[in-house]
Amino acid sequence: SRALSPSLNDPYTAMAVLEHLGDALCFLRDRGLPNGRYERNGRLLLFMPVSDFQGLVETMLNLIRQYGRTHPAVMIRLIEVLTEVCACLDDARRRDVLKLHATLARDEGLEHTWAQHDREAIERRYERFLRADAQRNGKRAEEPVIVEHHE
């Protein structure tokens, strides 16, 4: 693998980046994203392809998940961050995108993790994600959702 410096290739950097990405996704909450159409007086001036929420999440998380899959701490933190973001979102479709990425993190983490304790920790985090998603269904974002990640 390549990096600008060896310090950028460690799991701690990945986990710190995940914190910031999670904060950014919570900041977006259920805000609309630009549609790429720029008009004036009803006349189309410019159309630019833009990403939707799913594309944004894929861009943010795919490489970290792919390169971090051999580090249980990265997979655990990824699922924890997705759980925290899930608790922010009203939009069930956006939560489904997060669920896909939580499932990928769980599956890939389990595939590359041999220590039983780490495998159990990954499973526990995934179960917490599922509980947070189930709890969010039918609730507005103003209602509290309990997200725990003590260990």
Where are the regions a protein language model picked out?
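Short basic (Lys/Arg) and small-residue
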Residues: S1-E151
